[in-house]
From Swiss-Prot:
Tagged with keyword Amino-acid biosynthesis: no
Organism classification: Eukaryota, Metazoa, Chordata, Craniata, Vertebrata
Residues covered by the DHHC domain: 449-499
Designated name of the protein: Putative palmitoyltransferase ZDHHC13
Region ranges (Disordered): 1-73
Purpose: Putative palmitoyltransferase that could catalyze the addition of palmitate onto various protein substrates.
Subcellular location: Golgi apparatus membrane; Cytoplasmic vesicle membrane
Biased segments, Gly residues type: 34-43
Domain notes: The DHHC domain is required for palmitoyltransferase activity.
Gene expressing this chain: zdhhc13
Basic and acidic residues composition-biased segments: 7-20
Amino acid sequence: MDWSEGDGSHSHGHMGDSCHGHGGGHSHGHGHSHGGSGFGGFMPAGFHGQLVPGPMDPTQQPRKSSHPEDSSSWDIIKATQFGALERCKELVEAGYDVRQPDKENVTLLHWAAINNRADIVKYYISKGAVIDQLGGDLNSTPLHWAIRQGHLSMVIQLMRYGADPSLADGEGYRGLHLAVLFQNMPIAAYLMAKGQEVDLPDLNGQTPLMLAAQKIIGPEPTNFLIKCNASVNAVDKVNRNSPLHCAVLAGNVDSVHILLEAGASVDMQNDNGHTAIDLAQQVHSPLLIHMLSVVKTERIKANSACLKLLNRYKVCLQSVFSVVVVGAFGAILDMRTESWLLKGILLACIMAVINLASRQLATVAVRSLIPSTGLIASVFWMVVTWVLWFLPDEPSAAVQMLFTVNITAVLYYYIRSCRTDPGHVKATEEEKKKNIVVLAEAGCLDPRIFCTSCMMRKPMRANHCFSCNACVAKQDHHSIWINGCIGARNHPFFVLFLVALNFLCIWMFYGSITYWSRHCPLHYSEEGIWGALTALMGCSPWLLYVFCFVFFHTTWASILLVLQLYQIAFLGLTTSERANLMHRQRKLPQAVSLRQNPFNHGVVKNLVNFFQWRFCGLCKPMVLDWTQQHPMGLGRDMFSSPDAV
């Protein structure tokens, strides 16, 4: 969800079926609303007036309207709506009571709040306006109106004057519930940071998460609330429905998926004894029935001792499994038999075992390990091949020493890349709340510097990784080869791992060519490429098999190494920063060189800073903790992408 203010009104409101029959329309019942539509805009029913053009930034005061009429003839309501402060002062000084409601039971403070007139609100408060005055058909406070309209700056101002967001309107909704229903997530975050509980029930006993799951079709704001630690198994007061019950009744597939991922119980029963699956059958939704049944079956399996053991030791077991599978394929190909039918049957059996294991045992977490454990298996069989095939033909101690150093470097830098914290940005709940309040009140609650997934302030050059579900300082990319992120703290180790891996592959090419030249005489000029491949296959199928996956690893590792060194040395950028800049360049009328960025200090200095080279004091690298480097304001971090939920 984009946290930038837009023009569109949200028609979700409070319409639609409710878990407990609470579902009235959302209208104030008054006839005029002026000012910007706001973030998640709200337009009262029966609107007939003209909207004053509003700002795109919800933290700024609206522009004054260039109305053709002379404001000296306006009544105080119209002057308030259009921001004519001097006319308002004139009428108040003439004796108008700022606490007096109009014929629709709406006070001047309501009109100032819904139109985001900060200076007029300040003036009315100084003249004795009641901050939490209830008014309108929905019996709402000015704060409720500002929340519905999406005016974050007005919400902040009213709360500074003592407005109480925990008060309920005529429909029973408190401030946080309204922010969620109108999908004003910055306001919801601010209210929670100021002390509103994420599971605060409305007067009908429903939490914000229940309302989101029931009334707003789509992943948000359900996902947002779960990230704020909303309870997925809370129940309402009327029917004891959980958020999952509400989502199923509303047919909200996205919310159901998110709630299940968050661990919502599929066995919880409401007052009528119905589970979520029972309700899915009642609403005749085959998709929801399938989703809920699959999750229920998976959770039953997850309680088995076998799967618990697999999840506990998944890295080791998956590595062993990959080593066995890669070795089994090669061993079958290397069998001394002329029967390709037998080899085909054995290979088919191996594929069947893999398929069975993936269906019965492999979870999403286990499947994500396949590339990294496949790489580990490949390196293992490279070493075995060197020892059993190449070592007897290579008596040179220097070559053996260099190979040993190389394989040690590969293992060392690979482990360091995997085990070193890439720079995960961490913050306590109190720090998160403090940052939200500070950024909101400074007008900087913006996705470029505030992560809407982690709910915390992002350091400069940090990005949110959706695979790791964390913000990573100076993130380069998420690598499938280490099953983790490459960031500020493990990036040098990863680059050195690529260097060592490329040298290992070169040694394997050297050993393969040397072995073939001695044991497999080839006549390429006479037999052609297919004849040569046939000869190699007949000479040593295993070696040709190993050569193929060595070639594969050489291809991606060499390309990735060249790109990494180019970005580090010549640009001073990470992969994600380069991608963001290239995307923005396409929108610019004139091309701008990627080298023109504040992090590019020249080739030598870039390399010194990246690898932290000192050379006995000859070099002085820049030492920075990128998890603590914060931009000073909007626009300072030109390389960050908005990680909006």
